[in-house]
Regions:
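Gly/Ser/Thr-rich active-site loops/lids in small-molecule metabolic enzymes
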Residues: 150-158, 208-228
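Short Gly/Thr/Asp-enriched flexible loops that form oxyanion-binding sites at enzyme active sites
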Residues: 67-79
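ATP/nucleoside-binding phosphotransfer catalytic cores, i.e., glycine-rich phosphate-binding loops
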Residues: 17, 180, 211, 221-310
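Nucleotide donor/acceptor-binding cores
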Residues: 1-4, 82, 254
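Glycine-rich phosphate/pyrophosphate-binding beta-alpha loops
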Residues: 135, 193-206, 274
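ATP/NTP phosphate-donor binding region
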Residues: 1-62, 74, 107, 308-310
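Catalytic core of DAGKc-family lipid kinases
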Residues: 30-31, 38-40, 77-190, 194
C-alpha cells in the first residue's frame, strides 16, 4: 500500500473542520493510501514536518497558499524529494484555483488523487522558495499584516479592507536598480511583482499565457504613485493581462537581480507571508522540476510538456 502524509493548517479558512478529518482520511484510503494527518501548531511547522519525515509516496498540503509554500520549502531541504500535492483550504487560494480546484474539500481530494504528477518550476528569492508570487511595495504588506482572525472571519473581504486603507495612504517610491535579460535599469518604483501564475490576489488571468515548466517567471515593475493611475491600472487588469497595462514594465526571464539604494524598511511578501530576509540585494531564479500531483483539468494550458512525469 502507498503511504501519504497530510499536513493541514487547522486555522485555514472556513471549511476545514477537525470533525471531518476522518471523512477525508477514508476518502484518501479509497485511492490505495495508508494516510496520516498532522496538524500544524505554529508558523514554520509545516516546513519542519516535511523536511524531517521519512520517505512517503505523497505529501498533501491542506491549507492556504502559505501552508503549501512551507510544504515546498521543507521538501527542497530534503536529500530525497517527495511528490507533493495541495488541497486549498485558505482565504484567497490563488494556487488552488490555478490548479483547477473548487471549494469542496471532498471533491478536491478526488480531483487531486485522480490527477497527474507534473514537474513544476519553483522560484527562489535569495534561496527562499515561493510557489507563485513575491512582491514588494504598494499593497504588498496587506497579506501578512491582515490579522489572521479577520481573515478567518471575513475571508477575502478582510484583504479588500486592508487594500482600501493602503490605497488612501501615501505611495512611496523606492530607488532600485534591477538586472534582467542582459539589461541594467535604475529608477523609482512603487511596487514590484515577481510571479509564476495566472491568478494573483484573486485576479483571474492576471497573465494570459503562463507555463509552470518553461524555466521562466514574470516580472512587473511599477512606477505609479498617483491614485488615479493606480485606479486605471486596476481597472485594466479586469479586461487585459498585466503585461499590457501602461506604466508597468514587464519582463519574462529566468534570472532577476534587484538592488535597493537604501535598506528597505518593509519586508517582501512571498505567497502571502512575510519574507524574513532583510537585505539590499535580492536575486530571483528558478528551481526546476519539483514534482506536484494535481488535477488534470488545467494541465494542458499550464504546462509546455504534456507527458506524464510518472
Amino acid at each position: 500500500m502507498k503511504t501519504c502524509v497530510v499536513v493541514y493548517n487547522p486555522n485555514s479558512g472556513h471549511t476545514l473542520k477537525k470533525n471531518k478529518i476522518h471523512i477525508y482520511k477514508e476518502l484518501i484510503e479509497k485511492y490505495g493510501y495508508s494516510v496520516t494527518f498532522i496538524g500544524t501548531e505554529y508558523k514554520g511547522h509545516a516546513k519542519e514536518i516535511v523536511s524531517h519525515i521519512g520517505y512517503v509516496d505523497l505529501v498533501i498540503s491542506m491549507g492556504g497558499d502559505g501552508t503549501f509554500n512551507e510544504i515546498v520549502f521543507g521538501n527542497l531541504q530534503r536529500k530525497t524529494r517527495l511528490i507533493l500535492a495541495h488541497i486549498p483550504v485558505g482565504t484567497t487560494n490563488d494556487v488552488g484555483v490555478m490548479f483547477g480546484y473548487g471549494k469542496s474539500i471532498e471533491k478536491n481530494i478526488q480531483l487531486c488523487l485522480s490527477g497527474e504528477v507534473k514537474g513544476m518550476d519553483i522560484c527562489l528569492i535569495n534561496k527562499r522558495p515561493f510557489v507563485y508570487v513575491a512582491g514588494f511595495g504598494k499593497f504588498m504588506t496587506i497579506p501578512y499584516d491582515t490579522p489572521r482572525n479577520l481573515k478567518k472571519k471575513y475571508g477575502h473581504l478582510a484583504y479588500l479592507l486592508g487594500g482600501a486603507k493602503d490605497f488612501l495612504s501615501r505611495t512611496k517610491n523606492y530607488d532600485v536598480t534591477y538586472e534582467v535579460n542582459g539589461e541594467k535599469i535604475s529608477g523609482l518604483y512603487s511596487f514590484m511583482l515577481i510571479s509564476s501564475a495566472n491568478r494573483i490576489a484573486g485576479f483571474n488571468n492576471f497573465y494570459k499565457d503562463i507555463k509552470l515548466d518553461d524555466d521562466t517567471f514574470e516580472v512587473l515593475m511599477c512606477t505609479y504613485t498617483r491614485k488615479i493611475d493606480i485606479i486605471k491600472a486596476l481597472g485594466k487588469l479586469i479586461t487585459s493581462d498585466a503585461a499590457h497595462v501602461d506604466g508597468l514594465e514587464f519582463y519574462r526571464t529566468s534570472h532577476l537581480k534587484i538592488t535597493f539604494k537604501t535598506h528597505p524598511k518593509n519586508a517582501w511578501c512571498v505567497d502571502g507571508e512575510k519574507l524574513e530576509i532583510r537585505t539590499k540585494t535580492y536575486e530571483i531564479k528558478n528551481e526546476r522540476n519539483v514534482q506536484i500531483l494535481m488535477p488534470k483539468k488545467n494541465i494542458s494550458k499550464l504546462f509546455v510538456h504534456q507527458d506524464k512525469e510518472s
